[in-house]
Amino acid sequence: MDADYGIPRELSDLQKLRSHYHPELPPCLQGTTVRVELRDATTAADPSGEHTIKRFFPHTYGQPLAHFLRATAKVPDAQIITEHPAIRVGVLFCGRQSPGGHNVIWGLHDALKVHNPKNILLGFLGGSEGLFAQKTLEITDDVLATYKNQGGYDMLGRTKDQIRTTEQVNAAMAACKALKLDGLVIIGGVTSNTDAAHLAEKFAETKCLTKVVGVPVTLNGDLKNQFVEANVGFDTICKVNSQLISNVCTDALSAEKYYYFIRLMGRKASHVALECTLQSHPNMVILGEEVAASKLTIFDITQQICDAVQARAEHDKNHGVILLPEGLIESIPEVYALLQEIHGLLRQGVSADKISSQLSPWASALFEFLPHFIRKQLLLHPESDDSAQLSQIETEKLIAHLVETEMNKRLKEGTYKGKKFNAICHFFGYQARGSLPSKFDCDYAYVLGHVCYHILAAGLNGYMATITNLKNPANKWHCGASPISAMMTVKRYGRGPGKASIGVPALHPATVDLRGKSYELLSQNATKFLLDDVYRNPGPLQFDGPGADAKAVSLCVEDQDYIGRIKKLQEYLDKVRTIVKPGCSQDVLKAALSAMASVTDILSVISSPSSVSTPF
Amino acid sequence: MDADYGIPRELSDLQKLRSHYHPELPPCLQGTTVRVELRDATTAADPSGEHTIKRFFPHTYGQPLAHFLRATAKVPDAQIITEHPAIRVGVLFCGRQSPGGHNVIWGLHDALKVHNPKNILLGFLGGSEGLFAQKTLEITDDVLATYKNQGGYDMLGRTKDQIRTTEQVNAAMAACKALKLDGLVIIGGVTSNTDAAHLAEKFAETKCLTKVVGVPVTLNGDLKNQFVEANVGFDTICKVNSQLISNVCTDALSAEKYYYFIRLMGRKASHVALECTLQSHPNMVILGEEVAASKLTIFDITQQICDAVQARAEHDKNHGVILLPEGLIESIPEVYALLQEIHGLLRQGVSADKISSQLSPWASALFEFLPHFIRKQLLLHPESDDSAQLSQIETEKLIAHLVETEMNKRLKEGTYKGKKFNAICHFFGYQARGSLPSKFDCDYAYVLGHVCYHILAAGLNGYMATITNLKNPANKWHCGASPISAMMTVKRYGRGPGKASIGVPALHPATVDLRGKSYELLSQNATKFLLDDVYRNPGPLQFDGPGADAKAVSLCVEDQDYIGRIKKLQEYLDKVRTIVKPGCSQDVLKAALSAMASVTDILSVISSPSSVSTPF
């Protein structure tokens, strides 16, 4: 099997064309001299967790933000790294394949070779298991040739994606030491980057010389916080899904007799569903976050869809397209509670066929109410992160089934007078995950790869490579690095089998912000989407011409560039210092004192633990 | 509802770009003067059915092939049509939406307006039901503006797609008379074109002045015969499906733990599955035609897949991608027989829950053996063409289930030593059907629209618009028209509820020719596909650059241009006549006589009814 990794392969004409595409580097990373500015120490967004995070990360918490600037940038404190001794770096895919992953490795390889041709990049074969077993492939131009700008993770493969147990951490450390690695780059999502931070702390504690760097690559788009604007893979996934969704919309409008229920891969959070809605304008989407916030039951959801179907029928429309995120099922309070009971029993070793009889009365009642196929799926063992096997639970079929039953009832009672309700169900995910990456994902991943090199060259440990201001063209991107521990939060409540992770700092999947601009855009258009069939067909992913440079709608509407604004604030503070120097007038000093007192008062109040709710 | 048809709509950037694309016309159709050559009378490919076809089509059988040539073409007998009195033409979508359908209407509209600005084109709203109810929308440049080169049938919509019963035929005739139509263009597949031929005959018989023209538009690609090389929509469908299949292949190769079972829409025949296999090189495909020819049972198929899984595991490969056409289920002899029994009972009014007890003993045994979900799907009422509801029967889940059971058994017995078998199932169809059409489909459909006009201008009735030599660039395409009745065959055997159609000439779906070049290409590569993972990713549908002008593999490898070769033969015959004129030498005459006697002997033998098996 391993012999197949990284082998050259036959490419289609389009793949060949793409393999010749070369992403642009932002000015700050061009050439071989990069200035590194390390400014203020970072803090966790949720102050209430800070104490715990500090305790878990004594060596790596509170490190400063890093900015990478062009050599000519006029920043007094920045350090120019001019010496580039040869280093050895390892890299691995950790977590589900996301389009663009290969380009991180390509970018890292290019940066390594530009700065010192003697630098060595080793790819671990088969993900974390390859790391533990020290199975490597040296990354060279030849190896990369047929993987540049290509989808999948097949250059190196991936496996179970966990570096968490003592045994796993020790195996990882042994590998880094045996291979004399100066750096270890972990490409993955929320879970893998959490593991990366813990690994970095362990390395710092034990004086292991390998620096650990994380890269935000996940199609779910849920590794989002004040430092991270977007994840590699999300753009492609949403574009491919939107292509398919809008094809289905066109189909619905042509035949006028089907309701399509489409479930979208994306784990617990509904980012993919929201973005696809903004791109393709289906009639409805039900976000897990809405359901959780309004505590909607499965019956509420059914009624809401039935009312929509009925409203459309009154406009003579007997077709429609409804999106459901795969995480929806866990967002429905009573289903979540049922799942927790089931998982608890599974953990106790109760066999699947015995579970029904051991559920609490109310859980048992819900369970027995559900159709046969969905019961079987709810009984599946939970995933390694303690969530249900979301990709295997056909929520779309469950909802379609309940809606159909209700519509037939309404038809019989005469309250619904439209055509007989017909549903067709889909699950979109696997068919998008292996796609050729979009231009944005190619560019973003490639530049992130370069950033990884500069993090290592600066000797930083436990950082994630970050690029901000992404909605602007690549030549305006800001490159930097943030300590992963500063992105962590601590969950204090929980129940069920996941209890073990309570109290341990971790990156948690960012949910859709119901007060954010993307959601606002959806809310404003929801009625129009529902009734007017303003379906939008962005078409298949293009690499040239209109649409090729389009970016995710949610990326473009959100307030962005947190890090740019942090820098702006620092400039203001510097300016105040320059203006209010000893010798300035009484009036100027008075005005400055008054204004600063007011600012500090306001900030103290709104950043006290009691008033903060984590924005992600 | 109707108010929504043909309304201008917001297009995405890519849709806008596409809406400005203008297909090229072959030289023969350029300008306003086209020469029509009507040569030899056509005959049915299967002589044994000829008598019956003649009886059903006394007015429209045996009409000559028509060729459209450029005005300057030196063909002695061709007629130049110079007068173009204003005509009124109706057009409707009939049958499942196929990408490119809109362009037939656009091409027809352009041709009408070029030849006489007073020509009128009426689109029927909502397919055949719009025809019966005489609901029309006049097609204008404004209406077309946002539908050019766009997918779906939403400009006019479509419905049940049948013009067959006396009542339906009479309603159609009434509409044509009331609207004073000179021509009626029916856009559809096998069934709709059969209806078109019968309608043409009826019109001829009753002296209705409306001429009926059919256009081969069906994503299934099964309207294929000596006159028709390809169908509008097939190219797009196969490209979109291949994009998704190859994404799944990349995914399989990255995660290395799943077997993907993908069922493909395409009705009874396996053209879509074959073409997608040739484009994306998955590990396996099981064509319905192979199963039928080898009389494989469902157990044989299971064993065959299990052996493949086992062979791959011996090469350390625990992943794979397997394609199944949706028609497969009907190709399995014992399942087909079971379906016939079920449909018979359903027709007798037996309710679904009672059917199991009334099946014959062997059918009952098979039925009870099948998993619960598939039993429910087999009990669905058959479609209007008497076939099972193929899109609703999850054959891929059935096969995956049976394979999993068998692999677990082998694992237990120790005959299989690979990893635990994991299957993920997909059905690809709806998400491809509404796609933006490929350049080929845009061009092909647009030119077919023009051909329709010339058929009507030449006063032909009961013809299908045909273009041959399609594998070459559009400027080498040959445009013509063939009587639909000449493409018909007569089924003499059959059982079950479909019996009524036995003995009536019809177009039957062309199955994959197991002696054809496309299948040969598959056979040659099958082992390599199975074991070597030579996955090919053509990428998303492009409209520019590499791949944009690619044509279906099966189109390119098949011997083509039947009509071009018919013309070539006529040239040979003409040449013989020129050479062997009275006055030629004894030797020349002797040689000619001997050669011609031999040729006629050979042709008589191989075209006798007993030796002909229909090639489609």
From Swiss-Prot, chains A, B:
Pathway: Carbohydrate degradation; glycolysis; D-glyceraldehyde 3-phosphate and glycerone phosphate from D-glucose: step 3/4. Regulatory subunit of pyrophosphate--fructose 6-phosphate 1-phosphotransferase. Belongs to the phosphofructokinase type A (PFKA) family. PPi-dependent PFK group II subfamily. Clade 'Long' sub-subfamily. Pfam families: PFK. The keyword Cell division does not apply. GO terms for biological process: photosynthesis; response to glucose. Its main location: cytoplasm. The gene is PFP-ALPHA. It comes from Solanum tuberosum. Keywords: Allosteric enzyme, Cytoplasm, Glycolysis, Kinase, Magnesium, Metal-binding, Transferase. Allosterically activated by fructose 2,6-bisphosphate. InterPro entries: PfpB_PPi_PFK, Phosphofructokinase_dom, PKF_sf. One of its GO terms (molecular function) is 6-phosphofructokinase activity. This is Pyrophosphate--fructose 6-phosphate 1-phosphotransferase subunit alpha. The lineage of its organism: Eukaryota, Viridiplantae, Streptophyta, Embryophyta, Tracheophyta. One of its GO terms (cellular component) is cytoplasm. Tetramer of two alpha (regulatory) and two beta (catalytic) chains. It is found in: Cytoplasm.
